[in-house]
């Protein structure tokens, strides 16, 4: 009989980051790491240094992302749109 093991490195708590999946013990969202990895081309090793995480935490976040890709891609699109709107508002205020 197979026993499925899970690694408890990803948590969701409504009191932390609105219940978005985070690396346990941090406020760092899984999507924050994914954006750095996919869009900014940061390697897993670079992410450990950038965010002071263990390699297992980084790979757990990436594994979680690929397991929940559709939902997290929606979150990422929403974050990108919000960032663009904030940037546009900031630029228009400065001019």
Model-flagged regions — what are they?
Residues 8-28:
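Short, Lys/Arg-enriched anionic-surface-contact patches
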Residues 27-41:
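Short, amphipathic alpha-helical "recognition" segments used to contact nucleic acids or chromatin
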Residues 2-4, 9-10, 16, 38-39, ...:
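Long, charge-rich, low-complexity intrinsically disordered regions
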Residues 23-25, 52-55:
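Structural motif
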């Amino acid at each position: 009989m197979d026993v499925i093991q899970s690694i408890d490195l990803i948590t969701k708590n409504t009191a932390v980051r609105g219940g978005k999946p985070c690396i346990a013990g941090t406020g760092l969202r899984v999507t924050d790491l994914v954006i750095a990895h996919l869009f900014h081309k940061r390697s897993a090793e670079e992410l450990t240094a950038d965010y002071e995480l263990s390699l297992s935490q980084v790979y757990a976040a990436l594994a979680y992302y690929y397991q929940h890709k559709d939902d997290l891609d929606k979150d990422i699109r929403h974050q990108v749109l919000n960032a663009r709107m904030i940037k546009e508002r900031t630029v228009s205020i400065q001019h």
